[in-house]
Amino acid sequence: MGKIIGIDLGTTNSCVAVLDGDKARVIENAEGDRTTPSIIAYTGEEVLVGQPAKRQAVTNPKNTFFAIKRLIGRRFKDDEVQRDVDIMPFKIIAADNGDAWVEAHDKKMAPPQVSAEILKKMKKTAEDYLGEPVTEAVITVPAYFNDSQRQATKDAGRIAGLEVKRIINEPTAAALAYGIDKKQGDNIVAVYDLGGGTFDISIIEIDSVDGEQTFEVLATNGDTHLGGEDFDNRLINYLADEFKKEQSLDLRNDPLAMQRLKEAAEKAKIELSSTTQTEVNLPYITADATGPKHLVVKITRAKLESLVEDLIQRSLEPLKVALADADLSVSDINEVILVGGQTRMPKVRAEVSAFFGKELRQDVNPDEAVAIGAAVQAGVLAGDVKDVLLLDVTPLSLGIETMGSVMTKLIEKNTTIPTKASQTFSTADDNQSAVTIHVLQGERKQSSANKSLGQFNLEGIEPAPRGMPQIEVAFDIDADGILHVSATDKKTGKAQNITIKASSGLSDEEVEAMVRDAEAHADEDAKFEELVSARNQADGMVHATKKQIEEAGDALPSEDKEKIEAAMADVDTATKGNDKEAIEKATQALMEASAKLMEIAQAKAQAGQGEQAQQSNEAPADDVVDAEFEEVKDDKK
């Protein structure tokens, strides 16, 4: 059997490693480099990847793609995609299904298709080193990648001719690389991963006993649209603004100038990690009627730090959430590992060190640790690495939409994967023959505040009073963090299932704010939940009262019937509003108005007609959650 390789598919740079004996080794590419720029160029005649693509970017900006990982699994209309549309020299377009795609030489391409070119380069690099074909790989993704982004990464692997044996989270891979040689004791490690396009924080416990190691992720958090590219963009915009002030020309309208500006900004940022001042000097950056124009701007480290200060602070918020989720304090963290090229910035290192109150580990290569960890995991899967157990988690809660537009969670965030969960739900209407299962991801109570992952129909439910059918919804997350959902009618055995392949990624605000928003809006969510509960109780009371009126027939005096119907109308009006007290008051008034109905029901029961009353008041099983599924219309079938 051939080797399984480990690939760090990065936003800015990618890296490939393989287990060589009992050590993971990073493989140098054809250019002699240990990392490969994640840049792809279409010249019209050939596809260039890595340094060759980067070298020709200035002369071919519209057909040279970089940071493509920021588009993978996302919709064109997403806010963060729209921000990139304005500053990228290449064309980002909307695909027919609304996804964010790119275009080169009038050819439309999906991000997984472009990312596959990088994976092909990694595959070839490994094959040249090993001297044998490579068909299997472990590929890393940001811990906070959602379901569709993980699926899109697997698709890229398949396009590149690789069977993706496992998708592994980048901080977890870095912890594997760090901890694999440390064979004794317990360590709680914080992995701060600020890469080219994404940010993750994972709190990981490494337990080593008698040569056996367990790597357990306690909590993870992050932002899938925060990274070195954003730091570069701050500097690019600053340089463009300075030039505009001086020359009254906006370089943002010139793709060639923007490509040169991007390269210069990235170079200046890197230089300012080792020096306190640098100069950006770009002769002949553009021209107007008066002649050629040159850009010359001095930048200090302090100026760069002021431009990106809020980005660094943004990365600290998820640290607080992750610690709280793990039920730990800063003092419980034994080691802090920095991963990702952007962590070389002194200001980033200083802020993270200050946050945790301790020195940072210096023995982890921020560019290579993730690929090495992926190679270790590949060795575990191949059986070459023994006595290592990796327990990863799902970053966001998963559930379905139920009655009152509430998200009912089946799997909580930071649950160890793989995992399964199921719950029994029922119908909202009498004789409902079909339900729609709406799958959601996020932390808020209101369905609309969470990410919709997809929906599917379960049809052929036998006619029955509402609340009687028992529909079991099961969630199954595999080791890659990809979700499979099924719904089964317990009575008929009819089932429907889906592997979630949502075409959209989480937007910047959704990803970054989901957990924090849930905490910030805790009171709002609690009130919303109480309001929905009051509405559901009121609806249930109206439904039961209508049935009792039918059963009472002529035994119910018309005067009482009119009072009850008026009370039901009041309940109906109240439930359309957002006043919980008004709904509860109207429900109580209906109960009081229905006193005569209770007397009639009791009289009928005493007269020996209890069987019919028992059937009409029969309740669903205890484990059935009152849920509302929209009935499938003809045009949805």
Swiss-Prot record:
Keywords: ATP-binding, Chaperone, Nucleotide-binding, Phosphoprotein, Stress response. GO terms for molecular function: ATP binding; ATP-dependent protein folding chaperone; unfolded protein binding. Residues 620-637 have a biased composition (Acidic residues). Residues 602-637 are annotated as: Disordered. The modification Phosphothreonine is found at residue 198. PROSITE patterns: HSP70_1 (PS00297), HSP70_2 (PS00329), HSP70_3 (PS01036). Acts as a chaperone. Belongs to the heat shock protein 70 family. HAMAP family: DnaK. This is Chaperone protein DnaK. It comes from Shewanella loihica (strain ATCC BAA-1088 / PV-4). The gene is dnaK.
